[in-house]
């Protein structure tokens, strides 16, 4: 039995949740997001709260209800507050420049990398070695951050590469003669 599914999702003022069959749509100041409920999950709306419950008592239904509750909570938080992810570029000559919806990355290769941001994600560079990504969609934001990091993931000897700001790189010692 999922403990996550038992907790209600609180809906702040300015956020509306509409359900059309299995489709759930969440609207707020930061945008509109939607997702499909699993067939084993039911959604009940009360004043300022959303309660998810399994359609039938089974282990799989409780698991799906817990997952749906977590996704719905992220949608509500995303359209009301939004999410952000910070990336750091560590290395000589590594820099980033944002031009509209394109992030131009110089990561030590012989050519610059132009990464086109998907719709719903914005980027800014307060310094040349820092990228701040913002979005209402937590899943899309994490995907974009992972794709940018994959161009030059941090190596364990000098720590050079693109890393998340809260990431700790385990360093190795160089081989000695």
Swiss-Prot record:
GO MF: rRNA binding; structural constituent of ribosome
Q: Which residues cross the membrane?
A: none
Could you mention a single GO BP entry for this protein? Answer: cytoplasmic translation
Q: Which GO terms describe its cellular component?
A: cytosolic large ribosomal subunit
InterPro entries given in the database record: Ribosomal_uL6-like, Ribosomal_uL6-like_a/b-dom_sf, Ribosomal_uL6_a/b-dom, Ribosomal_uL6_bac-type, Ribosomal_uL6_CS
Organism domain of life: Bacteria
Which cysteine pairs are covalently linked by disulfides here?
A: none
Claim: Hydrolase is one of the keywords in the record: no
Q: Which UniProt keywords apply?
A: Ribonucleoprotein, Ribosomal protein, RNA-binding, rRNA-binding
Hey, which family's this protein in? Belongs to the universal ribosomal protein uL6 family.
The protein's matches in NCBIfam families, at most eight in alphabetical order, are given as: L6_bact
Fill in the subunit field for this protein.
Answer: Part of the 50S ribosomal subunit.
Q: What does this protein do?
A: This protein binds to the 23S rRNA, and is important in its secondary structure. It is located near the subunit interface in the base of the L7/L12 stalk, and near the tRNA binding site of the peptidyltransferase center.
Q: Which PANTHER family match?
A: 60S/50S RIBOSOMAL PROTEIN L6/L9 (PTHR11655), LARGE RIBOSOMAL SUBUNIT PROTEIN UL6M (PTHR11655:SF14)
Q: What is this protein called?
A: Large ribosomal subunit protein uL6
Organism of origin: Acinetobacter baumannii (strain SDF)
Q: Which gene encodes it?
A: rplF
């Amino acid at each position: 039995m999922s403990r996550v599914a038992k907790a209600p999702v609180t809906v702040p003022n300015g956020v509306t949740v509409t359900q059309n069959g299995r489709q759930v749509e969440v609207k707020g100041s930061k945008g509109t997001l939607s997702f499909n409920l699993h067939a084993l999950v039911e959604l009940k709306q009360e004043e300022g709260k959303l309660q998810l419950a399994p359609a039938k008592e089974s282990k799989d239904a409780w698991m799906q209800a817990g997952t749906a509750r977590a996704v719905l909570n992220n949608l509500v938080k995303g359209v009301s507050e939004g999410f952000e992810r910070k990336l750091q570029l560590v290395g000589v000559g590594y820099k980033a420049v944002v031009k509209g919806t394109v992030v131009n990355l110089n990561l030590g290769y012989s050519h610059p990398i132009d990464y086109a941001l998907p719709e719903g994600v914005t980027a800014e560079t307060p310094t040349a070695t820092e990228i701040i990504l913002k979005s209402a969609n937590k899943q899309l934001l994490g995907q974009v951050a992972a794709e940018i990091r994959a161009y030059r993931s941090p190596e364990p000897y000098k720590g050079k590469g693109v890393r998340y700001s809260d990431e700790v790189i385990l360093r190795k010692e160089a081989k000695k003669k």
